[in-house]
Structure formats: structure tokens, C-alpha cells
Amino acid sequence: MARNKINNETNILADNEDNLPIPRVLPSNVQAEQMLLGAILTNNELLNYVSEFLRDEHFFEPIHQKIYKAIEKITEKGLTATPITLRSMLTQDELFQEVEGAEYLAKLITMSMMVINPLDYGKIIYDLAIKRNLINIGEEVVNNAYNSSLEVEAKEQIEHAEAKLYDLASEGLNEKSFTKIGISISESLASINRAMKNNDHIIGISTGLIDLDNKLCGFHNSDLIILAGRPSMGKTAFAINLALNACNNMRLKNIRDNQEIQSVGFFSLEMSSEQLTTRLLSMCAEIDSTSLRTGILGEEKYNRLRKEANTLSELQFFIDDTPALSISAIRTRARRMKRKHNLGILFIDYLQLIRGVSKSENRVSEISEITQGLKAIAKELNIPVIALSQLSRAVELREDKKPMLSDLRESGTIEQDADIVMFIYREEYYLTRKEPAAGDAKHAAWLDKLNKVYNIADIIVAKHRNGPVGNVPLYYDSQFSKFGNLETRTFNSN
């Protein structure tokens, strides 16, 4: 026989010189389907062994899909599924009549006599269904590549295909059943023991800021944390500080516990990776960003810059600055990072720049889809997800500028899905814009008030699903965009 080859014009697999198409049949095992259905009809208890992973659409034959679904409906009502009860439910169905349903059910019962382990048959049916879905995805990928317009980039098609493949690979794996309380207690005790052994008693990923850690106990796996603030409050700067601290603290913890080093992922939808790394360099080397942009540096500053650049280059810190990503693209890329680089924590700057998948005209619905997607990523990958968010302009219309939960844009869904909501607020920013004239009697009082809030940023924990809320004042060095502990005015030293 001649070797297989592809006909380029028709994309049909051929196995001879005449390019005759090879008839290919979708993978299935009709006999296994018949034997399993017969066994379940003989003993309804067997349904419990396969129903957790096997659904009606996993069957290849349409009549078998209908029979399995009917069995599920009957047993859900507390009744016994038998050929007689099935016949009364399906008697008006055209397909059931076409296969002479009564006789066919009797045939299934007869075939069940040869069934030894029904679970094996269920797994065979499930596995073949996955393979058929894999074929469908492959065909869709090919068709989309042939028929795509210039508006759809190849990279977007790859991510779409990757997402479908990942969902297929994960099918059935994320469906958790009841867990015995003893197992949950063991997991809780293990977390408590880890906290007791840690000198800082932090269970989650340390923020590198003592007072904030005392309030939050670090960032916890599967949590969605929203960090919100008005422009110029320092949202991105604070997020960069948290990300760098997390990267260093995870590394130390991983080394101590002899674990694989975890990485930080940072989706920067607004700033370029170069702008973000320039901020990091400014922060770590303590060189103002203007000097870095203009290149006006003395030898001492330049040597300091090179040293910090070398240190940062060794970190497991990954930046994706692709603009206008969809929530599905973020999920796909986060999964890839988890697989390739052991992603430990994810930052997104910022929420309102993410595109929804459904392209709803209702922005509140779209934000709801996005926040639910981010929470799903946190749970699926078992990592903390920190998403930055804008606040509405209503803050600027009030005398008291301190933000509240109602100030969140599309606040209902964000507040609902988040485990923690934090606001960043700098009273110094607003006071400097209200300076009275130098000779004014109010100037002295204004100056006294300004001195009290100088270089202070308040982190307002407005929602904390598993802990206390309240205000955490931090030291803020505006020149280098560094956040530290207020009492000691020190920064994370890792």
C-alpha cells in the first residue's frame, strides 16, 4: 500500500496514488453503550457509579442518549427505571419507535448479563466521547484557519483553540463531590500548623508590609482581591510593590520548604512592560523616574541601577502587556503560566480594560462576567488574583474623598465576587490642591494638617470575607513610588 498523503486541494487524507478518500468513522463503542444501559436497567444502583462523570451527550447513538437521560429523570423522581417505565416515557418519541423501542430495551437487558464491571464500560464511553470532541475541535481549528478574516489574528485563534483544548482536558476533573469533614479538618490543621511554625504567623503570601499582613494574614490561594482607587492615588505603584514583595517572599518560602520556586504573573493592560520595569528599577535603585527617562545619571547611580537590574532579572516575575485582552485570553495565558512557570500569584492592571467574551452592551453584565471569570481563575489555579479597579467620579464630588464600596464602578458585581476589597487613599494628594494663600490665616492650620499626612497612604480594607476590615496606614515615598511600614518607615528588605 502506498504511504498516506494529504491532498492539498481538498485536504482529504488519501492512501493511494489516485487520491481516493479514506472513509473514517468517529470513534465509538455501541456495544459498550448497550451493555452499560442494560446493566443500569437491571440494577439502578449502578447509575451512581457512572453518573458523576458520564452524561447523556457522551453516548454516541442518539437513542442511547435518550434512554440514559430518561433513566436519570426517572431515578431523580425516586422511581425505578425499568423497560416498562422507560417505555411509558419514550413511547411518543419518533426515534424510540423507529428502533422498535420495546424490543430494543429487552435486547439491552439480555446483553447486560455479560457485564462484569459497569464502571469500566462507563469509562470507555466517556473516553471515546472525549476523542470525538477532540476531533470536532480539530475540525473547527482547521475551518477557522481557512475561513478567518483579517480582523481575527492567528494568535487569537490559537488562544481560542488552546482554551477549548484545556476545557476538554479539564472536563470532569474540576467537579468536586462531598468531602468528609475529617479531610477538611486535616487540611485546616495543616494550615494552622504552618502558621504556628512561621515567625510572622502568616499563612498566605506575605505582602511584605507588617501592618497589612496583620490585617489580611497575607494573600490566600483562591481569593479574588480588588485594589481600587482614583487616578494618581498610586494603584499601579502599590500593585508593583506588592508583586515584587510577593515574588521575593514566595522564593524564600519555597527555598525554606524545599519546593519548586513559584512565579508572579502581571497583566499590564495599560502600561507597557518597559514602563513597568522602569518603575521597578526606579523603586529598587531609588533613582527618580525622570533621571531614568532622560539618562542623566552619575556613575554611582548607574552602578546602583545595574546592580538592581541584575537582581531583578533573576526573579520569577513575568509581565504580559498585551492590551485589551479578553477574560478567556487571560484565563488561557494564566493556565499556561501555571503549567510552565508554577504561577503562584496573579496581578491584573486593570479590571475595566478587560474585554468580556459575550460582548454584552450592558457594561454591568460584562463586568460581572469578568469578575466571575477572575474568581474562577483564582479557584481553578489555586492562587490569589489581585485585580486593580477604577473608582467612579462620585468620589470627587464629595467633601470627604475617602472611597466607599459604592464608589466602585459597576460596584454590585465587583463587591459580590471579591473576597477582599481594598482602597488606596492619599489625603496628601487632595490637601496639596487646597493650599490657602501664604498670608491667609488658614495657611498654618493647613500646613499642620499636611505634615500629619505627608508621605502616608491609607489602605482601606472595606471588605474582607474571612477577616476584619479597617484602615492600614502605610509609608509612601512618592519620589520612588515605594510603600513601606509606617511605624519604622522601612521597606520589605527581601
Curated annotation (Swiss-Prot):
SF4 helicase domain: which residues? 198-490
Q: Provide the family line.
A: Belongs to the helicase family. DnaB subfamily.
What is the designated name of this protein? Answer: Replicative DNA helicase DnaB
Coiled-coil zones:
none
Question: Domain of life here?
Answer: Bacteria
Record-listed E.C. numbers: 5.6.2.3
One Pfam short name: DnaB_C
Q: Which PANTHER family match?
A: REPLICATIVE DNA HELICASE (PTHR30153:SF2), REPLICATIVE DNA HELICASE DNAB (PTHR30153)
